[in-house]
Amino acid sequence: MKLAHHLTIRSSHLHINGQDCVALAEKYGTPLYVTSEDRVVEQFESYKKALGARYPKVQVLFAAKANGNLALMRALAAKGAGADVFSSGELNLALEAGMAPEKLLFNGSSKTPSDLKLAVEKGVKVSLDSLDELHQIDAVATAAGKKVKVSFRVNPALEVPTHPKIATGLATSKFGIPHKEIPAAYKEALVCTSILPVGIHCHIGSQILEVEPFVRAAEVMVRIAKELTEMGVKLEFIDLGGGLGIPYHHDTDPAPTAEDYAAKVIPVFKAGMEACGITPELWVEPGRSLVADSTILLTRINSTKKAHKRFANVDAGFNLLIRPAMYDSYHEVIVANKADAPLNAEYTVTGPICETGDILAPDRKLPELAAGDIIAVLDAGAYGYAMASQYNSRPRCPEVLIHGSQVALMRRGETVADLKAAMEQPPWQK
């Protein structure tokens, strides 16, 4: 199996950033998320370099929904990242991490009045998803005596090769305004009291392993930019979204890079802007491709069982990594304490949750396994802990961050006390 360079095998043990995964499991316990900060920064810098070499005004926003840990966001903020945020919670975390308000875009298809008020108060840009939202935020900004910079989210009506639940640019998607209706939306925005329409925004989907769909999205956005410029809209930024995928099947999936993306998309974008006579900032919103392969989930085998097939029952389930259950997603797995042992058996790796679908890795070629072995689930940094839950009243696990040779918790593990912390006893039960 191909491994990214921050993952190595030494003395039969899997290592991440030079740290022995078995030793980490012993020190911090399992289940345990382990993240390489250096890998996240490396991936971010690859976007900055590839895009910046081809277009002079680029802003890379981290899609905070992929992994909202403050430590990761601080590391990215230190390198100049902004963020695409989808809630007041993500907005507050991005600001606390040190991200500049002007580098934040508040996205979302169903923002609350308090979301809009917070966006205006903090001075961030807002991607509007409907005309209702336009008039709501105009009223909020007017009441506050402020102007708010906005874009509209464009639905480009593009078919993309990905799971239907994460294809966000389809004509039937809940996201955005149909691309043919965008000029009318901007006409309405131009006459609002407190609205400054300065951008356009799209996002076509996630885990896309081809560059061509992004080229088609850029073509749609260039056409819209031309129409808006002719209407008198002064575009300060055009956000092409994120969605570049990663090779979850390490040996067979294509692995388009930021360089591949830039080489195909930037010529289309740059030529379009030159034809319009404008030089807006280009914004992109990578999430998965920044953080997914930075992280592994370490989980210990509680027991093995032979029934109609062989099972390895581990202490992490879809409470901590729901992607396999939700999307039938594939994650490579390695036995961290037997990382170079012969793959002479087949197991289905299952979690502890009371659901038949709690399967992390079905029918995998693995070494002979026993209780106590440590399995590493790879590429768990995007939509892993971010989508974790306390289902079955299981406290969520800790997260560890590695920077160079330093290792530290970036989130403590929860306890039973945390499960009860927000619960109240009604007065009639006292």
Q: Language-model features: where?
A:
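A generic local secondary-structure boundary/capping motif
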Residues: 116, 138-142, 174, 188, ...
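A charged N-terminal "starter" segment
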Residues: 1-149, 187, 192-196, 230-233, ...
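Active-site-proximal loop/turn and secondary-structure-junction residues that shape catalytic pockets
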Residues: 66-68, 89, 110-112, 130-132, ...
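Charged (often Lys/Glu-rich) extended helix/loop segments that serve as interaction or gating elements
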Residues: 264, 270-273, 277-430
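Short beta-strand segments
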Residues: 63, 149-155, 201-203, 239-241, ...
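General structural feature for long, well-ordered alpha-helical segments within catalytic domains
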Residues: 20, 36-39, 43, 47, ...
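Active-site loop/helix belt of alpha/beta enzymes
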Residues: 2-3, 157-302, 392-394, 403
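Short acidic, glycine/serine/threonine-rich loops at helix termini
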Residues: 73, 96-97, 116-121, 137-140, ...
